[in-house]
Amino acid sequence: MLHIKTLAMLTMAASGSLVYAQQPPAAPAAPAFMGPCSNLTCEVLNDWMRNNVMVYGVANAMPAEKYAFKPTPEQQSFGERVLHVAQINVTLLQGLGAKTPAPAIDPKAVSKAEAMAAVQKAGDYGNAIIKEFGDQQLTVRVSSPWFMGPMSTRQRIIYFLMMHSQDTYGQLVVYLRLNGITPPASRQP
């Protein structure tokens, strides 16, 4: 785990320096990892943060002037896909019954600075909710989105969101490569 953490931090540092000139000055930083875990909350939180670092990294890799890029006219733009991750994360996290207030995500915020800020807000919201629930509450069954059946554990819904984010991440990688950009995760030795 320590090797993965170190490698992730080095990759983030290297990719950040390569795209610093492209990143808006007000863009939020990617979250740090908690470290080795001994309980469910820590594991879920580490996975959530790792997932958000990947999404944030791929969003940051695309230059601001390319955020409107669409592989085909029928597809969403890069910025719309990034914003989609933030929107779905906040929407489904709101259904988990947390006391932590949800951040407002502007559905029309598709500039690089706005989309990255939305991803950061959604990630921070997830961090707060996971910490709020803790081990016992993460395993409680709640009403779930229709496509997951009538009831699911909070943990399952959070992992669904990570899976969905990774699916969208894969799409965003194609957008980057179509623009001649190597995704941050592919820059690792």
How would you name each of these model-derived features?
Residues 1-8:
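Bacterial N-terminal signal peptides that target proteins for export
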Residues 19-21:
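Boundary at the C-terminal end of the N-terminal hydrophobic targeting segment
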Residues 45-56, 66-105, 144-189:
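Short, contiguous alpha-helical
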Residues 61-67, 130-139, 177-183:
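Surface-exposed helix-capping loop/turn segments at secondary-structure junctions
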